[in-house]
From Swiss-Prot:
Ranges in a coiled coil: 47-94
Organismal lineage: Bacteria, Bacillati, Actinomycetota, Actinomycetes, Kitasatosporales
Entries under SMART domains matching the protein: AAA
Protein name: Proteasome-associated ATPase
Positions of the UniProt region annotated as Disordered: 1-22
PANTHER family cross-referenced by the UniProt entry: AAA-FAMILY ATPASE, PROTEASOME-ASSOCIATED ATPASE
Quaternary context: Homohexamer. Assembles into a hexameric ring structure that caps the 20S proteasome core. Strongly interacts with the prokaryotic ubiquitin-like protein Pup through a hydrophobic interface; the interacting region of ARC lies in its N-terminal coiled-coil domain. There is one Pup binding site per ARC hexamer ring. Upon ATP-binding, the C-terminus of ARC interacts with the alpha-rings of the proteasome core, possibly by binding to the intersubunit pockets.
UniProt GO MF annotations: ATP binding; ATP hydrolysis activity
The encoding gene: arc
Species: Streptomyces griseus subsp. griseus (strain JCM 4626 / CBS 651.72 / NBRC 13350 / KCC S-0626 / ISP 5235)
Length: 588
């Protein structure tokens, strides 16, 4: 179109060879005019083209951004499709099974137990065959080959170990229905010591036991560590302690002398007497003293002995045969410890609660089987070497006579209520010169703490043991009609003495907080003694006076009536029948 305009504007060019100069000049002038016009229009066209280029570049940038967004969307869609495909493929896969590893074979395969079958399968290269342990759970693919190692089973049935078989890899266990079964020991159990009576975790499907389960069935009844109590902390029982040392320590420390004299060591000791007089304390001190003696004999820095503290009432079980089984487990454990040459003390506290006279039961006859079980353990076919049975009771008359005969509980030691001299010894254990003593009391003894403490003890013991009107406690009537007045000293005990000292210490603390005067005074002890008596004025709290008297340590003629003679805050009490007493005392 532009070329056509140019041809019009230019006109017709003269023919070649034309001799008309005017025509040529006119043509050239037109050509020059056209060129001048084009030259004038050139910047405008250039500007238009530049604007067009900018517009195109802008459009190109927008299209590129849109293209990038589309590409990102496509990539995300592709990733989602791939993930969905993997999810579909995963959900479409057959379920993976589990099995229990039994053993590895030389050809690179292994034996497993799964689905009630024992199989020999291949192992994935990603699993180290040497790292698999007996009893370990493994994951299987659809071909039942091992593809991953798992943990050991953590759930199952509880069984009781009876014994380890000779190969050391199997065990005889007893289930909850007393059914015996031979099981395999998983590898974790091969590295530890397990003993008869331990509760084990059993996978009944594979027949493996995996771990020892802490079970309070026997553990809560047995305290194996030796108590940190020695004879020096026991006051007023020197003669009884000497008897126990002769019965317990001599046979173990000098077995050659006993053998030379053909003397059999005692199998058991019975500590009997009223409550709160130190029976349990002595039994604890026996184990500690024996451990120290063993250290002296063997030359070891720390001697070793075991103290099995059997809590009688907790040993009882409502199921038939369970109590007897617990007793067997206790003595089985004692034999295991004693087989190492270590002395073992089996202590039955409140012995009458377990081993009552056979036939004395009212609602049951459980003692008819419990007592023979203990007798069989003490002197049955299996002897007790290095095992000493100690029983404590405040109703020894209720214990079956077969247990108390010689050859079983040979040594019988009565723990009496403390007299005045024994009470001084007991007070000296709790009222020591190292306590904060009041300056006034110290000044009376020229500042000597030992003399002041001794004088305090002397004063409070005289207050407790004086047969005065204020110390009268009970009037008892015997079956023959005789009457007797009993004083508080007749019911004194080491536990009561400790309580009196503790009361006095609390009074001293309160006096310091209220008055600013620090130190224990003899007045605190005397007041504590009075408060202790007042608190226990309702101590006889049973409707059977004779039973109460037997528990309290009063033996002899049967008591048919008890009348209290305590001087109360309102003056002298005329006495009252025991049937009307409602409060509960501490020491029964």
């Amino acid at each position: 179109m532009a070329a056509h305009d140019d041809d019009i504007n230019r006109g017709t060019r003269p023919a070649r060879g034309s001799e008309d100069p005017a025509g040529q000049v006119a043509y050239l002038e037109q050509e020059i005019a056209v060129l001048r016009r084009k030259l004038a229009d050139s910047p405008r066209h250039t500007r238009i083209l530049e604007e067009r280029i900018v517009e195109l570049q802008t459009n190109l940038a927008g299209v590129s951004a849109q293209n990038e967004r589309l590409a990102n969307t496509l990539r995300e869609a592709r990733d989602q499709i791939v993930a969905l495909k993997e999810e579909v493929d995963r959900l479409a896969q057959p379920p993976a099974g589990f099995g229990v590893f039994l053993q590895a074979n030389e050809d690179g395969t292994c034996d497993i137990f799964t689905g009630g079958r024992k199989l020999r399968v291949n192992v994935s290269p990603s699993v180290e065959l040497d790292d698999l342990r007996r009893g370990q759970e493994v994951m299987l693919n659809e071909a039942l080959n091992v593809v991953e190692a798992m943990q050991f089973e953590r759930a199952g049935d509880i069984v009781t170990l009876k014994e380890i078989l000779e190969d050391g890899e199997r065990a005889l266990v007893v289930g909850h229905t007393d059914e015996e079964r031979v099981v395999r020991l998983a590898e974790p159990l091969l590295d530890i010591t397990i003993r008869s009576g331990d509760a084990l975790l059993l996978d009944s499907r594979s027949g493996y036991v995996y771990e020892v389960v802490p079970k309070s069935e026997v553990e809560e009844l047995v305290l194996e560590e030796v108590p940190d109590i020695d004879y020096d902390k026991i006051g007023g029982l020197g003669d009884q302690i000497e008897l126990i040392r002769d019965a317990v320590e001599l046979p173990y420390l000098h077995p050659d002398l006993f053998k030379e004299h053909e003397l059999r060591p005692p199998k058991g000791i019975l500590l009997y007497g009223p409550p709160g007089c130190g029976k349990t304390l002595i039994a604890k001190a026996v184990a500690n003293s024996l451990a120290k003696k063993v250290a002296e004999v063997t030359g070891q820095p720390a001697g070793k002995s075991y103290f099995l503290n059997i809590k009688g009432p907790e040993l009882l079980n409502k199921y038939v045969g369970e109590t007897e089984r617990h007793i067997r487990l206790v003595f089985q454990r004692a034999r295991e410890k004693a087989s190492e040459g270590t002395p073992v003390i089996v202590f039955f506290d409140e012995m009458e609660s377990l081993f009552r006279t056979r036939g004395s039961g009212v609602s049951s006859d459980v003692e008819n089987t419990i007592v023979p079980q203990l007798l069989a353990e003490i002197d049955g076919v299996e002897g007790l070497e290095n095992v000493i049975v100690i029983g404590a009771s405040n109703r020894e008359d209720m214990i079956d006579p077969a247990i108390l005969r010689p050859g079983r509980l040979d040594v019988k030691i009565k723990i009496e209520r403390p007299d005045a001299e024994a009470a001084k010894d007991i007070f000296a254990k709790y009222l020591t010169p190292g306590l904060p003593l009041h300056a006034d009391d110290l000044s009376e003894h020229t500042g000597s703490r030992e003399a002041a403490a001794h004088a305090m003890i002397q004063s409070v013991v005289e207050r407790m043991y004086t047969e005065s009107e204020e110390n009268r406690f009970l009037e008892v009537t015997y079956a023959n009609g005789d009457k007797e007045v009993l004083y508080f000293k007749d019911f004194n005990s080491g536990a009561m003495i400790q309580n009196i000292v503790d009361r006095a210490k609390k009074m001293a603390i309160k006096a310091f907080l209220e008055q600013g005067q620090k130190g224990l005074r003899v007045a605190h002890l005397l007041q504590a003694c009075v408060d202790e008596f007042k608190e226990n004025e309702d101590l006889p709290n049973t409707t059977n006076p004779d039973d109460w008297a037997r528990i309290s340590g009063k033996k002899g003629e049967r008591i048919v009536f008890i009348r209290t003679l305590v001087t109360g805050k309102q003056g002298a009490d005329t006495g009252r029948s025991i049937d009307t007493v409602a409060n509960t005392g501490q020491y029964l």
